[in-house]
């Protein structure tokens, strides 16, 4: 497995390749990331992954400086699984050699709701770095996890609207045996918080079942789920039922025509903010 740190080296090694499968990450890899790489290998060759902690997507009170940098450990994990041909691990100067004044701004109705409401500028930072990485790597396919559902939808829409020659492939959320979605931030949970954390997924499962059983009062369903989380010590940002294809709130016609829906939630347990979702 090759490790490169500059865009020039990346392009030199990949010259002539037209079936590249790409998995962008911020490092601190876990089994969920490795599953994305395994799926990428089924859809292209060679598999390239990036490790870059992108400052643009962190807010002023978020954990950019605290975010774990574990490059050597990450390399060892990927080398063990042998799914990845090349790791692109640039530093900040390589990705942003000058102030990034040109940025990608998602539409308000997609980028300023849910995560975008509570993390202003987050998706602008995500889209900007993803566009830059796609320009550097030039993949045929790129794999993203459904755990970051809104991010997946926004990146997919960006690639479609810019007519980028890349297919965005989604991987199902990888979970621990008790249902907790794997996340680099899970390491911040205390023993007691880790025992409580699966409640988020369990509540989404109950919400899903109630919709399948015919309940249609979206606001009441959301409020009840949020209240139940709060009763167990969570600080809830949102529990929201949305249409899958555009993340808008479903109306009566959507239920009648059985439009695919998704339940999404974000809440903080102790000092750790967790997100999850479940398709319906």
UniProtKB/Swiss-Prot annotation:
Enzyme class: ligase
Family: Belongs to the pantothenate synthetase family.
Entries under HAMAP family matching the protein: PanC
Binding site for (R)-pantoate: 57, 151
Assembly notes: Homodimer.
Binding site for beta-alanine: 57
Binding, ATP: 26-33, 145-148, 174, 182-185
Protein name as catalogued: Pantothenate synthetase
Annotated coiled-coil segments of the chain: none
EC number: 6.3.2.1
Catalytic activity: (R)-pantoate + beta-alanine + ATP = (R)-pantothenate + AMP + diphosphate + H(+)
Intracellular or extracellular location(s): Cytoplasm
Keyword Cytoplasm: yes
Listed transmembrane segments: none
Pathway: Cofactor biosynthesis; (R)-pantothenate biosynthesis; (R)-pantothenate from (R)-pantoate and beta-alanine: step 1/1
Any one Gene Ontology BP term: pantothenate biosynthetic process
PANTHER family in UniProt: CYTIDYLATE KINASE/PANTOATE-BETA-ALANINE LIGASE, PANTOATE--BETA-ALANINE LIGASE
MF terms (GO), sorted A to Z: ATP binding; pantoate-beta-alanine ligase activity
Known role: Catalyzes the condensation of pantoate with beta-alanine in an ATP-dependent reaction via a pantoyl-adenylate intermediate.
GO CC list: cytosol
Key words of the record: ATP-binding, Cytoplasm, Ligase, Nucleotide-binding, Pantothenate biosynthesis
Anything else known: The reaction proceeds by a bi uni uni bi ping pong mechanism.
